[in-house]
Design a protein with these regions (language model features):
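Repeated loop/turn-to-beta-strand initiation elements of outer-membrane beta-barrel proteins
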Residues: 14-16, 68-73, 103-105, 142-148
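Outer-membrane beta-barrel "beta-signal"
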Residues: 17-18, 25, 164-171
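Gram-negative (and chloroplast) outer-membrane scaffold detector with strong preference
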Residues: 57-115
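Transmembrane beta-barrel domains of outer membrane proteins
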Residues: 62-66, 94-98, 135-139, 147, ...
Length: 171
């Protein structure tokens, strides 16, 4: 039976997390005309709308600091890059929730804010983006974690548009 064991950061050391996965796997976004000579449906030389809702491969590096706030929250910094030249650097807070007596099953909710640079894919409507989500890990006896993270990235209505993007990352 799965039972909640302890809330709070168990490890006293900082932790590096690396992973890879899919950026914008739900293919949110929109199509936009990028024809400077007229509309996309112009009879002479018109172009089709350009889609900004493709998914791509994402690479992730995060560092979780050992210092805790309120004995629960751990600050962390991270960086994502995609194979379509989109980049996102962020800072946020996480909390490790341990399950089972072995403390080997961990759920880590996270919340972060950062700076996003659009690449050749989804346009998120603003440079400032917020990321919410979490990780589900199995922690081995040597403290190595293996898991998956699911996240939503959004500008929270700060920009002209707010299509948002989702990420699934194996860590």
């Amino acid at each position: 039976m799965l039972s909640f064991y302890k809330i709070g950061a168990f490890e006293k050391k900082g932790r590096l997390s690396v992973g890879g996965g899919i950026h914008n796997y739900m293919e949110n976004g929109f199509e936009r005309c990028e024809n400077p000579k007229g509309g996309c449906n112009a009879p002479s030389g018109g172009t089709a709308p350009v889609s900004y809702k493709d998914s791509s491969t994402v690479y992730s590096v995060e560092y979780f600091f050992s210092k805790r706030l309120i004995n629960i929250l751990k600050p962390f910094v991270g960086f994502n890059g995609t194979d379509k030249d989109a980049y996102y650097g962020y800072f946020g807070f996480s909390a490790d929730l341990y399950f089972l007596n072995c403390k080997c099953f961990i759920i880590t909710p996270t919340l972060a804010a950062g700076w996003y640079i659009d690449g050749d894919e989804i346009k998120l409507g603003n440079r400032v983006q917020f990321r919410s989500g979490g990780d589900i890990y199995y922690r081995f006896k040597n403290n190595v974690r293996l898991g998956v993270g699911l996240y939503h990235i959004s500008n929270a209505g700060l920009g002209d548009s707010n299509p948002g993007a989702e990420q699934a990352i194996l860590k």
